[in-house]
């Protein structure tokens, strides 16, 4: 009897673990059409979340049921002159992959001597996929 209970527990554990595992594919299926959102066009709820998080590097997503907004912030920087490049935005079988790069000010740039909090917000069509930030 005791062996039957132990075997049943092991089988249940294996079954439950297998059901919870979802394979995350990194194979690119298609590029995603997107636009970079100006600050005045960011939904208020999202803008408030950005303001709360901007001191430290952060990543977040926000949906209004029609569009999906992806945000990457690079935290406090000592000067102005930073820009953010979208390296990749594409889908796999079950994920959205979003990769960005922070570029610092150039040697010849006129630099604002004040702390800045660079972030980028992109808007794309809503997809119910997990977002992977790179």
Model-derived features with residue positions:
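Exposed, flexible binding/inhibitory loops of compact, secreted disulfide-stabilized domains
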Residues: 3-8, 18-134
